Amino acid sequence: LNPQNYDGIILARETLHEKNMQRRVVERLRESGVPVISVGAKTEGMGCIEFDDYHAMSQMVRHVICEHGARKLAYIDGPKEYSDAAKRAQAYKDVLEEEGVPFDSHWFFKGDYSVEAGTYVVSELDRMHRIPEAIICANDCMAAGAIMELQDRGYRVPEDVLVTGFDNVSIAKDNSPRITTVDCDRETMGYRACEYLMTKTAK
């Protein structure tokens, strides 16, 4: 990719999973002088459009606790390389503390945003005889996997176990039952990114 071939660039930084690759791409874009806007993650020296993952996950966790009365909440985290995953996980921990729900490390699982991560966590919870009242997932794919595995093991969703996702991608709508999720409104973010670049590149 030669940045000079473009009038402007939208950088979805966290689609570059490897940190060194992120660093090299960001440095090259900065040096190019081409207008760049980062979507989803703050990047020094660039404009940024960022979704408030922390606030949205806080609302989701608080809803599960306060509206549904759940006190035993498992959490499936996203990859450590993703800043959005870190914000979502911190929101889960903070809301538990604020609502007087003890944090239990045995209900906090590392995931990788895949369907398989959701199925694995449920199989582990069932093996330990620790199926919770709710499973909060850092994205929709893991939520879909969790629901599928729960159903395979005879649990009803949401009657026996609540499961929530995040991102509102197509799998959330296509799943049965539909996944309760957070809409990150990526269409609006993309529109605003284009607007920003158009103002920067206008002659």
Short names for language-model regions:
Residues N2-G8, T15-K203:
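Bacterial carbohydrate/catabolite-sensing allosteric modules
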